[in-house]
Amino acid sequence: MPSQKIRIRLKAFDHKLLDQSVGEIVDTAKRTGARVAGPIPLPTIINKYCVLRGPHVDKKSREQFEIRTHKRLIDILDPTQQTVDALMKLDLSAGVDVEIKL
């Protein structure tokens, strides 16, 4: 599969778990002889939610929650068939969302 590129995009709420998964992917790709570009940190998405503390009155009393979505991008350049097989067999954590584009 010469002159191709695999683009892997990872998302997670926990950045430590995300970096661990990125490290596993990069090590697997380098071990099989492919060139790796990245990991590239993409902007973190912050969703903020504001809710009332009490169920009835007192609108001035509110509570704010936020959830951060961390993202990373990895490009695998010149992947071999061994690289694709190793990536398919790789078992990542449950809290990491993986999108792969060929």
Swiss-Prot record:
Listed SMART domains: Ribosomal_S10
Domain of life of the source: Bacteria
InterPro entries to which the protein is assigned, alphabetical: Ribosomal_uS10, Ribosomal_uS10_CS, Ribosomal_uS10_dom, Ribosomal_uS10_dom_sf
UniProt-recorded Gene Ontology molecular function terms: structural constituent of ribosome; tRNA binding
One of the GO BP terms on file: translation
Keywords: Ribonucleoprotein, Ribosomal protein
Pfam family, one: Ribosomal_S10
This protein's GO CC annotations: ribonucleoprotein complex; ribosome
Oligomer status and interactors: Part of the 30S ribosomal subunit.
Family affiliation: Belongs to the universal ribosomal protein uS10 family.
Purpose: Involved in the binding of tRNA to the ribosomes.
Name this protein carries in UniProt: Small ribosomal subunit protein uS10
Organism: Geobacter metallireducens (strain ATCC 53774 / DSM 7210 / GS-15)
Name of the encoding gene: rpsJ
